[in-house]
Each structure stands twice: as structure tokens, then as C-alpha cells.
Design a protein with these regions (language model features):
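Structural recognition of alpha->loop->beta junctions
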Residues: 111-119, 181-202
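Active-site neighborhood of HAD-like aspartate-dependent phosphohydrolases
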Residues: 1-30
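Short, acidic loop-to-helix structural element flanking the phosphoryl-transfer center
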Residues: 66-94, 100-108, 132, 160
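Conserved Lys-Pro-Asp/Glu-containing loop-to-beta segment of HAD-superfamily phosphomonoesterases
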Residues: 129-159
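Metal-dependent phosphoesterase signature
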Residues: 41-80, 88
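Short acidic capping loops at alpha-helix termini that bridge into adjacent secondary structure
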Residues: 23-27, 51-52, 114-118, 146-150
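Acidic, Mg2+-coordinating phosphoryl-transfer loop and its flanking beta/alpha structural elements
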Residues: 150-190
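Helix-loop "lid/cap" segments that line or gate small-molecule binding pockets
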Residues: 14-15, 35-50, 106, 138-139
């Protein structure tokens, strides 16, 4: 899911509400993978150690909750990828650090994701990524051993979690990386530049 536009808009509203100038959407996009931490860092230069961080984090969540399906879409090719997975009778799921407070409405708004065999949110397990627990929970819900799973992610934490869970790992360059990260250095088993590249990997598996 490409939620960067709504993430950025929620953070930018916090700036304009305070009389600060709006920032271009492109400024927020590379930080979308870091969630509220990334958005507040870009909007205000704020880190979690700031005394006002928790209050602004909740304000960001409230802003995002009111508009999280306005501009959010799936990345190009994801719809076709899911259709192909279903035709090949391959199970798939979603593991995210986002709270169920956000993931459940998003899933409801996007019928395509009703075909997911598992959905693991930030509070589904005691630990979030990069801990392997959420990925192991997803594998359990799918009825699969971890070594029969491939985890695709666009953040270094995703690959760390996948490797720790004993899964095949694929780094995706089409997410929010920008020029701030190098997925070739993450230690993933493979790197893809578009969702449909995953089909080619599966054919070789």
C-alpha cells in the first residue's frame, strides 16, 4: 500500500495549523516507511526524545485517521501480482508495524486485500519488526513453516526481521527509499524493482 500521500498530508496539516509553511509532498515520501517518527522528523525536525513527541505523535495519528483513505493506493502492479498469486494458489499476507486502528479501515477500503490469508498489525505480537515475532505469527496463521515463506519489504528492518525468522527475503526498491538507503546492502536474498518482478523470482524458486 502506498500510504505516503496521506501520511504526508497528515503531517503537513500539523505545520499549517501552527502557521508554518507547507512542505512539498516529495519531502515526506522518503520518510513514510518510518511512520510517525519519520513524518514528525521531516515536519518539525523532531526525534522521539523530544518532550513534546508523544503529544504530537498522537496528533499526527488523529490527523491521519481522518484521511487515511483519501489518497492511499496500491503500488503499480500490486493488483496484478495478487491476482497471479491467487491463480497459482499461493497464499499471501501482510505484516506491518502499523496499528490495527489504521490497518483494519485500510483493508476494508481496499477489497483486493480481503484475499490475504493473514494480516498482522503492530500490536498482534509483543514485539514489532525488526523482531521476527510478527513474521512468525503470519506464517503460523497461514499454516506454513517460515522456511516456506518469502518476505518482501522496503525497509532494512523488514529484511532483518525476515532473516531472523528464517524466511527468504526480498528487498523492494519501489517503496519509499529515495536516495537515503541502499537495499543492496541489506543482505536480502534478492532485490526487486517492481511488484511483478516477484513473479519471476517465484518461477525460479
Amino acid at each position: 500500500i502506498d500510504s505516503a500521500p496521506d501520511f504526508g498530508a497528515a503531517a503537513d496539516k500539523m505545520r499549517t495549523d501552527r502557521g508554518m509553511p507547507s512542505l512539498p509532498a516529495e519531502r515526506y515520501r522518503p520518510m513514510a516507511g518510518a511512520g510517525a517518527r519519520g513524518m514528525l522528523g521531516e515536519a518539525f525536525g523532531m526525534t522521539p526524545e523530544h518532550p513534546d513527541y508523544e503529544a504530537l505523535r498522537e496528533e499526527f495519528f488523529v490527523n491521519y485517521e481522518t484521511r487515511m483513505t483519501h489518497l492511499t493506493t496500491v503500488f503499480d502492479g500490486v493488483g496484478h501480482l495478487i491476482v497471479q498469486l491467487l491463480q497459482r494458489q499461493l497464499m499471501w499476507g501482510v505484516v506491518t508495524n502499523k496499528s490495527a486502528r489504521f490497518t483494519e479501515p485500510l483493508t476494508f477500503a481496499m477489497p483486493l486485500f480481503a484475499t490475504a490469508g493473514a494480516g498482522v498489525s503492530g500490536e498482534s505480537t509483543p514485539h514489532a519488526k525488526p523482531h521476527p515475532a510478527p513474521l512468525l505469527e503470519a506464517a503460523s496463521r497461514l499454516g506454513l513453516n517460515p522456511d516456506r515463506c518469502i518476505y518482501v519489504g522496503d525497509d532494512h528492518r523488514d529484511i532483518v526481521a525476515g532473516l531472523a525468522a528464517g524466511m527468504g527475503t526480498v528487498a523492494a526498491t519501489y517503496g519509499y527509499l529515495g536516495d537515503r538507503a541502499d537495499p543492496l546492502q541489506w543482505g536480502a536474498h534478492a532485490v526487486i524493482n517492481s511488484p511483478l518482478d516477484l513473479l519471476q523470482l517465484l518461477e525460479k524458486a
